[in-house]
Design a protein with these regions (language model features):
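Mg2+-dependent phosphoryl-transfer enzymes with acidic/Ser/Thr/Gly-rich catalytic loops
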Residues: 305-313, 330, 502-559
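Conserved acidic, metal-coordinating active-site core of Asp-based
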Residues: 150-215, 408, 412-415, 419-530, ...
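Structural recognition of alpha->loop->beta junctions
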Residues: 228-241, 282-305, 366-382, 443-444
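Substrate-recognition/cap helix-loop segment adjacent to the acidic, metal-dependent catalytic center
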Residues: 223-236, 354-374, 475-493
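Active-site phosphate-binding/coordination module
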Residues: 84, 88-121, 331-436
Length: 559
């Protein structure tokens, strides 16, 4: 067993930026470019918080996933940039423009998108009037021209200012706000806005974390800011921007005191807009900003209902670890598990190389049903949330990989199977199938032409293939492995989980990466993760956890 005392999760040394804008509102870098910049800056995560818009989130997430797929395993699991769905809602409070940042809301909900679209249309109507008013006085501008210069963006006053600067009508962007379109300027037209209370309630309705942005930018004074926080806290405000690009050390300290006073989550960000805010950098603001990852971890724990930063999470293999020789759980083990979860408020994850449908059946048969319980199947390729009854993470082998694996298995005289839903799928069932299904109670679909048309036989790309040889695994499996690795170099994870089983998994699918992902997802420091296992496929999990426990009955590599 390894002690967690000296364990350090590198994620917690990295900064985050939870307030960032792209070209989908008034920033000058695309969502894809922001992902690259965040990686170059060494950020663990950033929140895309465009004004009244969710249009850039999918692009940023796709860019982040694509970057991870082309990184090494270690880079993908430890330093891949996480993109957080965010938004910045403009509201009106006592004649002032107050901004509410929302994180982790359900941006795919049609009702959410419809409401945000209405916010956007109100902004469009206001901007059209402002541009028309300027044009009437001879200023060379039209809303259509600004829109053409910012394709796909939600147009803000910053876009209008940038257009006037780029067309050489004004000498600086600041001039536009001080003389033309600032709140007290002749061409400013206010727009109908929702109240900050309604913005907070709106975000909470869709599962979001509402945060008061840059609290000292509104110049409310101490009493005024206190009153605003009281009103917003009453309707569900969850956070306040403690770290901000313009905050002095004293203001940061003051904001942290307010967070503690009102039991709010501290957040922080640069409010990066690219060249629209000269000198302001992503992640570091004007040079002194550092938003610690621990703040994001706290926000994640709040979202998932995790009590605090001391909560522990136990990842446990079943076969040869949690389970007895009769594939059950002993009374003493069950009592210890109950105490760990119910008595101390910790979390449990049943982690197995088995197919997810079988892991679910196993948990049901064993009557394992704890609050905040998760299942990890296919050696970590799939994660399942038991409370929400849904899969939220899945990595797969391509149909091309599956087709090649089946063809090579036939060439080498090896039995191979894959999985589709709750079924084992193979071309020809035999003694290996019978051996496997002694304990894994899944239906078998045979005579399936997986090696010819996997895209027809299978309903979706699978998480895993399994080669079984009961006679001469040391002689027959290595040549097969060599051929498969030559066909897909560095694209699969091939591992002998026992003397007879060769696991064929997606390249990043290991129990260790699953542990890392789930801890990151929940906001739990890996020093608080415990893992127990007995086989080679458990080793990455034991190495990734703060405390790794190798079973005495296990193979030497699991010690």
């Amino acid at each position: 067993m390894r002690d967690a005392a000296a364990f350090s999760d590198p994620l917690y040394t990295m900064p985050v930026d939870l307030h960032v804008h792209s070209t989908r509102s008034d920033g000058t870098f695309t969502p894809t470019q922001l992902v690259s910049m965040a990686k170059e800056k060494g950020l663990a995560a950033f929140a895309l918080t465009d004004h009244d818009s969710v249009n850039g989130i999918e692009e940023a997430m796709d860019a982040s996933i694509d970057a991870a797929k082309h990184a090494s395993i270690d880079a993908a699991r430890n330093t891949g940039v996480e993109v957080i769905p965010g938004i910045e809602l403009s509201t009106e409070y006592e004649g002032k423009d107050v901004h509410i940042v929302g994180l982790y809301y359900d941006y795919e909900d049609p009702d959410f998108q419809s409401a945000v679209n209405e916010f956007t249309q109100e902004r469009v109507r206001r901007n059209q009037k402002m541009c028309a008013k300027m044009a009437a006085d001879g200023i060379p501008i039209s809303y259509e021209a600004v829109e053409a210069a910012n394709p796909g963006a939600v147009i803000t006053r910053a876009n209008i200012a940038r257009y006037l600067y780029d067309t050489h009508y004004i000498s600086s962007i600041d001039y536009a706000f001080s003389h033309l379109i600032g709140d007290t300027c002749p061409y400013f037209i206010p727009r109908e806005k929702i109240s900050p209370e309604k913005a907070v309630s709106f975000l909470r309705r869709f599962g979001g974390i509402p945060i008061l942005a840059h609290p000292f930018e509104y110049h409310l004074g101490d009493e005024g800011l206190d009153l605003l926080l009281q009103r917003l806290k009453a309707v569900g405000l969850m956070g306040i921007e403690v770290y901000y690009c313009k905050h002095s050390p004293e203001e940061t300290e003051k904001a942290m005191a307010l967070a503690k006073k009102y039991d709010l989550l501290p957040s922080g960000g640069s409010d990066f807009h690219g060249t629209n805010k000269p000198g302001l950098e992503l992640g570091t603001g004007y040079g002194h900003l550092f938003v610690p990852y621990s703040l994001l971890a706290g926000i994640k724990r709040a979202k998932h209902g995790i009590p605090d930063e001391t909560t522990k999470i136990f990842f446990c293999d079943f076969d040869g670890t949690l389970g007895t020789s009769k594939k059950d759980i002993s009374p003493a083990t069950r009592e210890a598990l109950d105490s760990f979860v119910y008595g101390r408020g910790n979390l449990f994850v049943l982690s197995s190389g088995r197919a997810m449908s079988d892991v679910k059946s196993l948990a049901e048969r064993l009557r394992l049903s704890y609050p905040h319980m998760f299942l990890s199947g296919y050696n970590g390729a799939e994660l399942y949330d038991c409370d929400r009854e849904e899969t939220f993470f899945r990595e797969t082998l391509s149909f091309k990989m599956v087709k090649t694996a089946f063809a090579l298995a036939k060439k080498h005289g090896l039995y191979i199977q894959t999985y589709d839903g709750d079924a084992i799928v193979t071309e020809e069932a035999g003694k290996e199938t019978a051996y496997y299904t002694r304990y894994v109670k899944m239906p078998v679909r045979e005579n399936a032409l997986v090696g010819e048309h996997p895209e027809v036989v299978l309903s979706e790309e699978p998480c895993k293939c399994l080669v079984i040889d009961l006679e001469d695994p040391r002689g027959k499996i290595p040549p097969f492995v060599n051929d498969l690795e030559a066909a897909f170099p560095g694209q699969m994870n091939l591992l002998m989980s026992n003397a007879n089983y060769l696991e064929i998994d997606p390249i990043h699918a290991t129990k260790g990466n699953s542990l890392i992902y789930l801890c990151r997802y929940l906001g739990i420091d890996r020093k608080n993760a415990i893992a127990a296992g007995d086989a080679p496929n458990d080793v990455p999990m034991l190495e990734a956890a703060g405390v790794g426990i190798g079973m005495l009955n296990g193979l030497g590599t699991a010690d």
